[in-house]
Amino acid sequence: MQLQSRSTIRSSKIIGLIPARWQSSRFEGKPLKLINGKPMIERVYNQCSLVESLDKVIVLTDDDRIQEFCEENSIPYLRVDDDCETGTDRCAKAIESIEADFFVNIQGDEPVIDPGSIDFLIKNFLGNDSSANVFPSCLLYTSDAADDSLRVDL
């Protein structure tokens, strides 16, 4: 399968995934800690909602408190209760149940992430014949959506 060109990026369904867990050895409850009156996860979600290339942004969690916050604030979420050691593991589990061509794993503790940087990452990745991009976010995709030479096995 050929990589998609910049002209076909908009014909792809691209979903932003924000893994958010309560338990942490360094900072328990970090997603709901307030930053100038707003929880961190809300700030991350709001920034990601400004990314033009994303069709939807979904918070991934295994915690009742984070789920409740998302429900109360109309933030799309998916409950991923599997034993996931990392946010990337949580994303890998989630993409099994979400219909899309491409997924962007956006770190849940980047409340001031630049939406333009995520757009740049997506357009650069889909518009170039490159095997990897390192950025504040990591592009993930379903195996049938991209050339096998670029597939990331999780």
Give the location of each predicted region.
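Short phosphate-binding loop-to-helix
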Residues: I58, D64-K123
